[in-house]
Amino acid sequence: MIIVFHRGAVIRPHRHRGKTESYHIIFGELDIVRFDDEGLPTRIVSMGKLASGKTLVYRQNRPIWHSVIIRSEYAAIHEVTNGTLPRRRERVRTVVAGRR
């Protein structure tokens, strides 16, 4: 599917059990933030067009908690996942600066 985000869009941390997902940047820039089970960030994948030197295509093949932060005014991705998504996603509270 094609997804277009506007800066300020809120994508809460979530994961997809039994699913893989891949993202391909069409335009704009965004970060994929991965979290551990306690809600602490473990990795940030900065995505952008090839000329930007950032990651163009990202694939996640495990049920890892993740969120998206839009870095440009707009960003569009082609997202591919296997199967249908459940109506309700798992969510985790994000821990900021060591506070819960």
Where would I find each of the regions flagged by the language model?
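Double-stranded beta-helix
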Residues: D37-S52, S67-R100
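Conserved hydrophobic/aromatic beta-strand scaffold that supports enzyme active sites
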Residues: I2-V4, S22, V57-R59
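A short glycine-rich, His/Asp/Glu-containing loop-to-beta-strand
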Residues: M1-P13, K19
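Short beta-strand His + acidic residue motifs that chelate non-heme Fe in jelly-roll/DSBH
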Residues: R12-H14, I32-R34, Y58-Q60, H66-R71, ...
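Residue-level recognition of short, solvent-exposed, well-ordered loop/turn junctions
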Residues: H6, A51-G53, N61
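Glycine- and acidic-residue-biased ligand/ion/polar-headgroup-sensing regions
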Residues: G18-E38
